[in-house]
């Protein structure tokens, strides 16, 4: 995009942020030319449930060399259930496979499913280790669900930057970070997400195909990371992170939708 269009986008994002009363982070990668639009692109934001993509990707990476891994069944105890378990709570008798935990984690943001994946991997630090192996030096996962969502301003735990997450998401969903079957599986799970309708998707034309993962936490933290297939354009990768100064602030999915609309308006 020409310089004046880019400046205009920055100005619109700045306006949006000012009117929202929070802190907004945006990173768009246009894979047509790998150009980036960044707004607070290198600042740290709490990831909340957007971190689930990296956890599931770490599992998918393991499954490249262990073809039975995703069929492995793990039990679910009553004591495993946390604050949000829409799928896991229905399977206390049978348990679930790692594939089922992965789908529940990405498509329903089931927190018990995420914790089961973390348990299998050996803890949050293993997800950080995986991020390093795909070239992401910024991502850090420190805690399990639901404490990873405390989103305390200035706390570096469970944070990344919009730019780092966008690059990793591009590598995982469109690049070579995962082998082809695993990459395709991640994309399929993200395209089937049920939680993103009011976030990035709401700011895009309805004909565009989207795969995304939302996140939310304290301080009105409202997040979405997406791979986008526009009607007549190369894929886009978009990260929108938003957090607020008051611990009990309301979620603002509308801010994410507005940011998505601003950065894709010229396409």
UniProtKB/Swiss-Prot annotation:
Q: Give any GO molecular function from the UniProt entry.
A: beta-lactamase activity
InterPro entries annotated for this entry? Beta-lactam/transpept-like, Beta-lactam_cat, Beta-lactam_class-A
EC numbers: 3.5.2.6
Q: Which residues catalyse the reaction?
A: 49
- Sites binding substrate sit at 213-215
UniProt superkingdom: Bacteria
Activity control, as annotated, is: Inhibited by clavulanic acid, sulbactam and tazobactam.
Its function, per the record, reads:
Hydrolyzes broad-spectrum beta-lactam antibiotics. Active against cephalosporins.
Q: What else is known?
A: The class A beta-lactamase family has a specific amino-acid numbering system, sometimes called Ambler or ABL numbering and often misspelt as Amber. A multiple sequence alignment was used to derive a consensus sequence and then the consensus was numbered taking into account insertions and deletions. This allows use of identical numbers, e.g. for active site residues, despite differences in protein length. UniProt always uses natural numbering of residues, hence there appear to be differences in numbering between this entry and some papers.
For this protein, the record's PANTHER family field holds: BETA-LACTAMASE, BETA-LACTAMASE-TYPE TRANSPEPTIDASE FOLD CONTAINING PROTEIN
Q: Which family does it belong to?
A: Belongs to the class-A beta-lactamase family.
Q: What is this protein called?
A: Beta-lactamase
Q: Which organism is it from?
A: Serratia fonticola
Q: What is the lineage of its organism?
A: Bacteria, Pseudomonadati, Pseudomonadota, Gammaproteobacteria, Enterobacterales
